[in-house]
């Protein structure tokens, strides 16, 4: 059968040379990277401690988290939190007005039973009984006395996981924190002459203004944010706060350091970012009532604007990440309105905008440090898209809005059709806004986010204003330009080729002859015969097959096999990665576990549709593992793929891996599977629809989910090439014998060919629907 190609790829897709895997890991790893480049660093990574950056105006901006500072004695200013970060137990801070208030804070490690300890507090040895019964949290205790030689009392305590504490002078009181993280709260002690209270810190500390008290509370409860700098973080003396800072202009170039061949230049720039979204709307074949996909795609935009009297030409590329897939299914009839998938960006999504302009700042964006940006927010509101149905009122997808807020900046490379541009990538987090979006004339209403249908709402572009600053290592000779790191546009060219190839593949669906397709689906296609129609295949057969298998290893089908084998402990102990598809077929425990899981689901989920859908998602693997004589969906999928490869004028060895992988995932998305028990047939689709009926009369009977799960474990699973509705329609209009019904239920290819050769319109229409579902 033609589906042999998929089974062959599943079996062999994990056979990858170690060197290839090491190279792949090295080229794709993008997380948990530690950077310590030092001066004149040659690195493509930017610092990721995203602060407000350099503020290039006349406004003085107070830092949110100032420090860390070394232990010392000083008189902290009023209305400033002193955030203490101790590392060892003991006295961490003392404060007194030398009149009637002596306050100290002690840190006690976890799991300490009640015991006497000696502490030196204000220069006096004090005996205190302390305890901390928590197994994992540290305990801060305030000890207070009202005279220099008086007795000490213990007061409000704080149980803390982050091991942070804070003190502030405000409104004639000393404020501290109490309670238990992550729900710690502020408390206070009244004191006279509070503004003259001197504090002695015995650990590193930070300064936070009272205006940012909410952030201070967040740090107390959850810990300090991760910090990554180009150099080690070393606590400074508090006198460092008195250093005079020279303010920079909004647009200027500053020489930081210079040698004979290299110099460090600081570039400060105002920036105007204009961008737009792009989308793809794909309509399914058939009568015109169904849409297969509405999705975002990257959008390039070129424009000019004036900066300090100079005209600047800029180029942006807007892309999205973390999209949410929505769908609407109005029914299974050919005239029912269906949108299989439309993408929406929400608060869990990100928008990336790559920016480049022709100014001096971007001539040598190769070796960069101290990269920072300060950008405004922007609101993006969706428009309306009319689903033009052949008959009836048109549904309209309308509304939706999100706001974009700056969340970081790093280096990137934009690929255009002619040149690569070293640029800055601005990352934006999203917040959903009013209005909501809805699909009119349906029950899809009051949903939030920005759909891909009309994200620009008729606007030519969205605009964001802001500033950025960076220090770049550049040649001392201004006439020399450092080479761009990625000077070729291989991936961009490949994406363009794939886009054109997908359009060609989808158009070729109309040219496939069904009788030839059935014959081709019966052939045992392997990798060589599948790709034999491609030019240069024989010369590059080995490398191309390896590339196909490496790409296929990441496909949804391969991941389904891995997930199944990993999740079933009984089967996983005896299944190796290389033979997973064979082992699943012979491992009864793997499919018995499906039945067990369905029993568990039925106790918590009352919907039969949900349960059958859960089983059906694994039936493709079950069917492939227990191959029968009947034809299956993967046979048709592989046959259509082979036919389109042979007919295509744009296919090449470079695009084959992506096309084969996409075909395995996207061809025939609406599948149904059946199991036969004597004269009873149980049929379920991955969309949750299910039927149970008699073979001879096609009369529906109650659907027993548990029995269906048990049959899946013990019986062959068959692709419902001719589904129940088509069979019933065929029987009602033409009448079929019980033997013909059995043959069609088993997807017997000979019987299918007979009906097609007889030009039976019902069977031909069903096969045409399956072919039209073979889209990329």
Curated annotation (Swiss-Prot):
It holds the Pfam family VP4_haemagglut. The keyword Isomerase does not apply. Disulfide bonds join 203-216, 318-380. Residues 484-511 form a coiled coil. GO terms for cellular component: host cell endoplasmic reticulum-Golgi intermediate compartment; host cell plasma membrane; host cell rough endoplasmic reticulum; host cytoskeleton; membrane; viral outer capsid. Gene3D superfamilies: 1.20.5.170, 2.60.120.200. The record marks 101, 190 as: Binding to sialic acid. Residues 65-224 are annotated as: Spike head. Residues 389-409 are annotated as: Hydrophobic. A motif (DGE motif) lies at residues 308-310. A motif (KID motif) lies at residues 644-646. Residues 510-776 are annotated as: Spike foot. GO terms for biological process: permeabilization of host organelle membrane involved in viral entry into host cell; virion attachment to host cell. In group A rotaviruses, VP4 defines the P serotype. Belongs to the rotavirus VP4 family. This is Outer capsid protein VP4.
């Amino acid at each position: 059968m033609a589906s042999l190609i998929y089974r062959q790829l599943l079996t062999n897709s994990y056979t990858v040379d170690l060197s290839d895997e090491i190279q792949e890991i090295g080229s794709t790893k993008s997380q948990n990277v530690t950077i310590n480049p030092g001066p004149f660093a040659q690195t493509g990574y930017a610092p990721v401690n995203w602060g407000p950056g350099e503020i290039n105006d006349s406004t003085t901006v107070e830092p949110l988290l100032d420090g860390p500072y070394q232990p010392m004695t000083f008189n902290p200013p009023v209305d400033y939190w002193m955030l203490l970060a101790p590392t060892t137990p003991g006295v961490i801070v003392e404060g007194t007005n030398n009149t009637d208030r002596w306050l100290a804070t002690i840190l006690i490690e976890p799991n300490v039973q009640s015991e006497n300890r000696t502490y030196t507090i204000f220069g006096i040895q004090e005996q205190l009984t302390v305890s901390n019964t928590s197994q994992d949290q540290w305990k801060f205790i305030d000890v207070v006395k009202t005279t220099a030689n008086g007795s000490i009392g213990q007061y409000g305590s704080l149980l803390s996981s982050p091991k942070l504490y804070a003190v502030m002078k405000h409104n004639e009181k000393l404020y501290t924190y109490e309670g238990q993280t992550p729900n710690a709260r502020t408390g206070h002690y009244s004191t006279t002459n509070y503004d003259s209270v001197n504090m002695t810190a015995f650990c590193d500390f930070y300064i936070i203004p009272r205006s940012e008290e909410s952030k201070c509370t967040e740090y107390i409860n959850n810990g300090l944010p991760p910090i990554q700098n180009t150099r080690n973080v070393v606590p400074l003396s508090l006198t460092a706060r008195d250093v005079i800072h020279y303010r920079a202009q909004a647009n200027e170039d500053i020489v930081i350091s210079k040698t004979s061949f290299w110099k460090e230049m600081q570039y400060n720039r105002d920036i105007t970012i204009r961008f737009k979204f792009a989308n793809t709307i794909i309509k399914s074949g058939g009568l015109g009532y169904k849409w297969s996909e509405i999705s975002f795609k990257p959008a390039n935009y070129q424009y000019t604007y004036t900066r300090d009297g100079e005209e600047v030409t800029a180029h942006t590329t807007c892309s999205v990440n973390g999209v949410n897939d929505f769908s609407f299914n109005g029914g299974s009839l050919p005239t029912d309105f269906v949108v299989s998938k439309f993408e929406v960006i929400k608060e869990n999504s990100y928008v990336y905008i790559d920016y480049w302009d022709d100014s001096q700042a971007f001539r040598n964006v190769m070796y960069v440090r101290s990269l920072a940006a300060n950008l405004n927010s922007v609101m993006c509101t969706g428009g309306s898209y009319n689903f033009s149905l052949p008959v009836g009122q048109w549904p309209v997808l309308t509304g939706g809005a999100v706001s974009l807020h700056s969340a970081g900046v790093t280096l990137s490379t934009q690929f255009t059709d002619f040149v690569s541009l070293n640029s800055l990538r601005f990352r934006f987090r999203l917040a959903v806004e009013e209005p909501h979006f809805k699909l009119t004339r349906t029950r899809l209403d009051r949903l939030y986010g920005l759909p891909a249908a009309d994200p620009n709402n008729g606007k030519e572009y969205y605009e964001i204003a802001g500033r950025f600053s960076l220090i770049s290592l550049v040649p001392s000779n201004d006439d020399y330009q450092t080479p761009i790191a990625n000077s070729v546009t291989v991936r961009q060219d490949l994406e363009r080729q794939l886009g054109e190839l997908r359009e060609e593949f989808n158009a070729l669906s109309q040219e496939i002859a069904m009788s030839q397709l059935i014959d081709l689906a019966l052939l045992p296609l392997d990798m060589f015969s599948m790709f034999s129609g491609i030019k240069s295949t024989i010369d590059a057969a080995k490398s191309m097959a390896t590339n196909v298998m490496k790409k296929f290893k990441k496909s949804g089908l391969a991941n389904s096999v891995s997930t199944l084998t990993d999740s079933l402990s009984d089967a996983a102990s005896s299944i190796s990665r290389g033979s997973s598809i064979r082992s699943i077929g012979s491992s009864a425990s793997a499919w018995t576990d499906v039945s067990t899981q369905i029993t568990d689901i039925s106790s918590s989920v009352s919907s039969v549709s949900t349960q059958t859908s859960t089983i059906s998602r694994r039936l493709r693997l079950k069917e492939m593992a227990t191959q029968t004589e009947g034809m299956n969906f993967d046979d048709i999928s592989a046959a259509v793929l082979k036919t389109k490869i042979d007919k295509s004028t744009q296919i090449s060895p470079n695009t084959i891996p992506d096309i084969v992988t996409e075909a395995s995932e996207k061809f025939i998305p609406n599948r149904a599977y059946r199991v036969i028990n004597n004269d009873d047939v149980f049929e379920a689709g991955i969309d949750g629809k299910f039927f149970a009926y008699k073979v001879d009369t096609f009369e529906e009977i109650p659907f027993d989910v548990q029995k269906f799960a048990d049959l899946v474990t013990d019986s062959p699973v068959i692709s419902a090439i001719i589904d129940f509705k088509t069979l019933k329609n065929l029987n009602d209009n033409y009448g079929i014998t019980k033997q013909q019904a059995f043959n069609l239920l088993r997807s017997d290819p000979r019987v299918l060919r007979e009906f097609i050769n007889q030009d039976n319109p019902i069977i031909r229409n069903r096969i045409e629907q399956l072919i039209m579902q073979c889209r990329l």
